[in-house]
């Protein structure tokens, strides 16, 4: 995959908001930006892939990406991606690593307004960015990070788990297939991901569930597809990580889609995948 690296840009270009429409499964090249920025999927679901692993954000979450952090986006479903670059003084209030944060109703409206088609003065835009930061920093960081292991045996296990998610195997049986003992794999998972294998697999299942539910798959069918023995176990695990039940999550996505639709797409949107976030902003500048 080609890599696009963005050199530092003048402040007036860096602090411009962007809107991009990505088709299902469309991906941007790996790239980085000179300023930290927030990425909000007003519709659809967005994955953030980095050397540290992946994060996933539906339309009731917002992603923070620090300055200089190499990353790639992947859209799940037709995704309306809004990008808001932050001045260093505001970026300092956010984590030094990528993070998924709760998108509050106030922050959502400020983001949609800031990235909307109506031109705003520099003062208004500055105040809107401050509103977003003030609001999203009141909630804790969301545990939606899936660490990426680097050991070849763990990578082989990950591939097997992803391929057979609806029929999960024990770590011992997975180890037999990749030529490693259960004890070795268990130790490696803890060392490389900071999680036990069951914790990591639950995180992976919830990531997959977020995508299926966003695609209007039923709760029962999602539970089965992701390998849970019964819907109750799925609902408990999902609620623990996401902070709402699968049904509440689906309802909130529908409401967010209506809100984003009423606000419009905010002007010209990049749809290609050749550079950076996949296109130019309203002024023709590549972000």
What is each stretch, according to the model?
Residues 69-91, 96-98:
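Ligand-binding loop in jelly-roll beta-barrel domains
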Residues 114-120, 136-142, 157-170, 189, ...:
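Basic, amphipathic alpha-helical hairpins
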Residues 171-172, 191-235, 239, 251-264, ...:
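Terminal helix-turn-helix DNA-binding modules in bacterial transcription factors
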Residues 148-199, 215-226:
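DNA-binding recognition helix and immediately preceding turn/loop
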Residues 91-162:
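Amphipathic alpha-helical segments enriched in hydrophobic/aromatic residues interleaved with Lys/Arg
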Residues 1-45, 285-286:
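Generic protein-terminus/edge-of-domain signal
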Residues 52-67:
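Short acidic-glycine-tyrosine-enriched beta hairpin
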């Amino acid at each position: 995959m080609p890599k696009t690296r963005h050199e530092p840009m003048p402040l007036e270009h860096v602090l411009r908001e962007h809107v991009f429409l990505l088709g299902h499964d469309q991906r941007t090249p790996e790239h980085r930006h000179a300023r930290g920025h927030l990425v909000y999927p007003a519709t659809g679901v967005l994955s953030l892939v980095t050397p540290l692993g992946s994060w996933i954000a539906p339309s009731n979450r917002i992603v923070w990406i620090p300055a200089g952090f190499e990353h790639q986006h992947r859209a799940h479903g037709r995704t309306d991606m809004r990008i808001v670059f932050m001045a260093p003084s505001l970026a300092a209030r956010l984590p030094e690593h990528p993070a998924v944060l709760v998108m509050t109703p106030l922050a959502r409206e400020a983001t949609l307004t800031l990235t909307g088609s109506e031109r705003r003065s520099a003062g208004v835009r500055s105040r809107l960015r401050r509103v977003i930061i003030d609001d999203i920093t009141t909630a804790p960081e969301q545990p939606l990070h899936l660490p990426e292991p680097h050991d070849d045996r763990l990578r082989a296990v990950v591939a097997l788990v992803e391929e057979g998610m609806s029929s999960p195997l024990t770590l011992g049986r997975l180890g037999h297939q990749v030529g490693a003992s259960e004890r070795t794999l268990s130790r490696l998972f803890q060392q490389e991901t900071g999680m036990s294998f069951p914790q990591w697999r639950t995180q992976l299942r919830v990531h997959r569930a977020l995508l299926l539910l966003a695609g209007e798959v039923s709760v029962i069918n999602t539970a089965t597809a992701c390998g849970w023995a019964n819907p109750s176990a799925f609902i408990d695990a999902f609620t623990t990580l996401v902070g709402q039940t699968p049904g509440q999550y689906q309802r909130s996505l529908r409401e967010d889609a209506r809100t984003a639709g009423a606000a419009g797409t905010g002007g010209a949107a990049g749809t290609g995948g050749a550079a950076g976030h996949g296109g130019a902003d309203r002024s023709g500048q590549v972000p």
